[in-house]
């Protein structure tokens, strides 16, 4: 069974889940799994380390599993153990091989690696594999084959590597070895992951990387990568991965929309304070300001803010959303379409969405195979009656325990009632399975 099919059958969630609103906000501190962004960066750095690295608090989800499986297929020794403190995490032990990335295949029989719809795995492995020898082929699911890769491929070709792709997207074939040059520049207008991919491998490759577009090296996820490289135990040791701030935003948002007095009865344990995750700023953005930028204020959690904006007391404007169009789905259009279906007054102009206070109603929400669409609208359903989430299993990408967290009784969850499409109540243990 290939990686795509296997991961689609590991989460036996119903085709549709209805969220029953809570009548009040529970006073609870929940845990959320580790940061996806940090976990997949740490896996690459651990593979390049001179010695064994133990990653504590690592996220265990589709995106991180495809990275682990790709590294294992390359020949890395990786041990995965349960995390007693968080069911969505694992302790991952990686035996690094320094700069000796295992060799690939041949021109006629390249070593093939599957990356699903994980942008981090697709971009990071593309640069990482250039450090090896031989021929590698990367492929993913259909949506990953539609997502941009051109700026990264251009930079790697500038370094002297041969990468074959019919349209500068996946699937692609990497002919490792080289480089001829030691300098390149990369544009991050479409994705900052292009720069992060190059920076993670730059020391081993002897590359000097210039970054163009947006805020350059100061762009939040690029800055995260640089900070992580500096802090990482590259001679071996232990590294603690902090909780995922994007995933935590749903619980801060839930507490906010359920609270009548502006307090924050729902909080997230071990909330990140390293400054690495821009979405750790989310609690400070509540109540929502009049204007918010995806580039300057929030990352993926700006989707959470947009989803709850119709419940705000004043109009909210969300700007510089262009990158959302190039991710798991066309997120700007998806948010506008599904919020409108729920009764929201929302206007799209260029890469800006303007959301007005609205009386919302229940609806059957398309998720577009996008984990964040499912989680955003499930959060909204904790307040708005009749929200029904189609294809809820898409949360397996980054937060497989999400619906279980909603349904688990206080103090370990929110204690919400979730139902299947036939109106049957779902138990927490029915909402999560690897």
Give, region by region, the residue ranges found by the protein language model.
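Structural preference for solvent-exposed beta-strand-turn elements
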Residues: 2-434
